[in-house]
């Protein structure tokens, strides 16, 4: 999803969250600093969630993915997202023209800036090595091996999540949609132990505050 309106992204994330932070914005001007929290009362409960992203996922879709991931509500699968974390405002000019000004940056619940870094998935399907091929071969054939390979994939993401630049390099923002992503998501959602580990180990990089 290439993006959308901030308030709509907040509304979508709010549907799956009980309370707490969804996103905040931070800029130089006092009015650019805002906090968006979920309203009390989760509307969708006890349902495991997988969010699919790639290099075309930007802005509003990144807000939803970051909120659900950082709050431990969903696992993220795919390629690193675009990294469009800036907020623009329109200034009306005396001659009738308009000036679009970057007003603020979006800060995920974990505290990191979405701009440039984007969302790093817990399970990467754009890695330049053979990780995806091994995963798919295991999922489509030997299911016990799939658990081992997916655990290894989670471990590799967890080991570099404190370095978002390195994580993005290891999981580049591929733009093409992969048919394997929904298949991996389905497998994880059907295997509770793997899903639980993905929630634990597939979180955000260390925050840039």
Describe these PLM feature segments:
Residues 1-209:
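C-terminal "post-core" interaction segments
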């Amino acid at each position: 999803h290439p993006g959308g309106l901030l308030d709509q992204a907040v509304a979508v994330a709010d549907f799956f969250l009980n309370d707490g932070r969804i996103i905040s914005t931070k800029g130089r001007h006092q009015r650019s600093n805002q906090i968006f929290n979920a309203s009390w009362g989760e509307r969708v409960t006890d349902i495991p969630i997988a969010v699919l992203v790639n290099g075309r996922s930007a802005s509003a879709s990144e807000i939803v993915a970051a909120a659900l991931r950082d709050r431990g509500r969903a696992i993220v699968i795919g390629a690193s997202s675009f990294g469009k974390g800036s907020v623009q405002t329109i200034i009306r000019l005396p001659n009738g023209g308009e000036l679009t000004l970057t007003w603020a940056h979006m800060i995920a619940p974990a505290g990191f800036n979405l701009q440039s870094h984007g969302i790093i998935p817990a399970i990467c399907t754009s890695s330049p090595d053979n990780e995806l091929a091994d995963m798919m071969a295991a999922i489509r054939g030997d299911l016990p091996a799939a658990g081992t390979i997916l655990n290894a994939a989670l471990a590799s993401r967890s080991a570099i999540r404190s370095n978002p630049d390195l994580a993005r390099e290891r999981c580049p923002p591929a733009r093409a949609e992969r048919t394997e992503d929904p298949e991996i998501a389905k497998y994880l959602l059907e295997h509770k132990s793997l899903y639980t580990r993905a929630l634990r180990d597939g979180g955000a990089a260390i925050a840039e505050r």
